[in-house]
Amino acid sequence: MTHLSFPNLSGKLVDLRELSIEDAIIIVSLMSHDISEYLYEVSPPYKIGDVLKFIKFSCDGFRLHKSIIFAIDYKKKSEPIQLLVETIGIKDIDYVNKKANIGYWIGKQYQGKGLATECVKLVITYGFDILKLIAISAYVFPENKPSIRVLEKNKFVKTEVIKEYHPLSNSYRNSLVYTIKNKK
């Protein structure tokens, strides 16, 4: 599978596009301790240098066909321009076994508006229809109930509980794995 150009996806509430350096300051402002405690790859405090590394990592992942990380723009009707509200991506793409992982987060002030649910739907549709994946999984902490609801609304099912999976300070946190299979 080769990517010719970065895909842009569009839904009723959001547009998904390639991340850019110009997004860095907004991402820092949206990242809070409340959000980062539920993310596997982010530790507070999240600084501009961290975001720039993430954007470079995202661009490299796309170039190397390992991941597709999208910026999420909210099509808020009351705003003259779209608002960046965070990121979603297909990661760890395995073209041989036709599977990948999904990860996402939404700025706290934009949660509860259906944005994550629509973003996940757009990305799994792209993964199944364009990338021809047969399974997409998500790793989520058991206490992250909003993310679990988003996955369940999109027909993901809990497939595994991994005990003491993710390091946190001097201990480890449990993780749940949710998976959706391509029915086509």
Which residues does each PLM region occupy?
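Short, conserved alpha-helical segments within structured domains
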Residues: 43-47, 68, 143
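A short helix-loop-beta-strand connector motif used in the catalytic cores of GNAT acetyltransferases and
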Residues: 56-71
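Conserved GNAT-fold acetyl-CoA-binding loop/helix
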Residues: 36-57
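A short hydrophobic/aromatic micro-motif that marks alpha-helical segments and, especially, helix-coil
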Residues: 47-49, 62, 170
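Short, polar/charged, Gly/Pro-enriched helix-capping and turn/loop motifs at alpha-helix termini
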Residues: 41-42, 65-69, 134
